């Protein structure tokens, strides 16, 4: 017993893998509910799906957030405000487009006042389809974002 010549176990990981693993466990989305998809976003944050267990805490300020969930119809008048919210977020930042209206204009695609997809205003990482998408679909989209973050090179040379 005591200190011997036993093999000691080591955990090895790259700095990229460690940083990305930490980032996946603390995604903080800013609450931007533009239409009916916001109800499903609130449903995903409530007790049944409980996004807190994934480390996801909704923040009221873009300066405290690293994920922007665009939930609903984006109109031309709201587009500059959405871009301003995106620009205020610290790096690294990710965008989830939630619902048919945010993805491509949805039901209101041919309206003069609707932006035909929020990807014309901000770069989108994950698209969640549906009208409105269910809370399960949003949770799946968040899991896909976590998988995307894990695969990203953070400090490695490109």
UniProtKB/Swiss-Prot annotation:
Subunit info here reads: NDH-1 is composed of 14 different subunits. Subunits NuoB, C, D, E, F, and G constitute the peripheral sector of the complex.
What is the documented function of this protein? NDH-1 shuttles electrons from NADH, via FMN and iron-sulfur (Fe-S) centers, to quinones in the respiratory chain. The immediate electron acceptor for the enzyme in this species is believed to be ubiquinone. Couples the redox reaction to proton translocation (for every two electrons transferred, four hydrogen ions are translocated across the cytoplasmic membrane), and thus conserves the redox energy in a proton gradient.
Q: Where in the cell is it found?
A: Cell inner membrane
Descriptive protein name: NADH-quinone oxidoreductase subunit B
Under the GO molecular function aspect, what terms does this record hold?
4 iron, 4 sulfur cluster binding; iron ion binding; NADH dehydrogenase (ubiquinone) activity; NADH:ubiquinone reductase (non-electrogenic) activity; quinone binding
Cofactor-binding details, from the entry: Binds 1 [4Fe-4S] cluster.
- Pfam families of this UniProt entry? Oxidored_q6
UniProt entry tagged with the keyword 4Fe-4S: yes
Q: Which GO terms describe its cellular component?
A: plasma membrane; respiratory chain complex I
Q: What cofactors does the UniProt entry give for this protein?
A: [4Fe-4S] cluster
Species name: Francisella tularensis subsp. holarctica (strain LVS)
EC identifiers of the protein: 7.1.1.-
Q: How does it sit in the membrane?
A: Peripheral membrane protein
Q: Which controlled-vocabulary keywords does the entry list? A: 4Fe-4S, Cell inner membrane, Cell membrane, Iron, Iron-sulfur, Membrane, Metal-binding, NAD, Quinone, Translocase, Transport, Ubiquinone
**Swiss-Prot/TrEMBL catalytic activity:** a quinone + NADH + 5 H(+)(in) = a quinol + NAD(+) + 4 H(+)(out)
């Amino acid at each position: 017993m005591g200190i011997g010549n036993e093999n000691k176990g080591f955990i090895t990981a790259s700095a990229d893998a460690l940083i990305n693993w930490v980032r996946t466990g603390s995604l903080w989305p800013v609450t931007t509910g533009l239409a009916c998809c916001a109800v499903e976003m609130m449903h995903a944050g409530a007790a049944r799906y409980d996004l807190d267990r994934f480390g996801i805490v909704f923040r009221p300020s873009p300066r405290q957030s690293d994920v922007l969930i665009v939930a609903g119809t984006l109109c031309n008048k709201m587009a500059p405000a959405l871009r301003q919210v995106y620009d205020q977020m610290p790096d690294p930042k990710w965008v989830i487009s939630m619902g048919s209206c945010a993805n491509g204009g949805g039901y209101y695609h041919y309206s003069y006042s609707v932006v035909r997809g929020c990807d014309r205003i901000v770069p989108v990482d994950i698209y969640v389809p549906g009208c409105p998408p269910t809370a399960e679909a949003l949770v799946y989209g968040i899991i896909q974002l976590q998988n995307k973050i894990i695969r990203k090179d953070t400090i490695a040379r490109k």
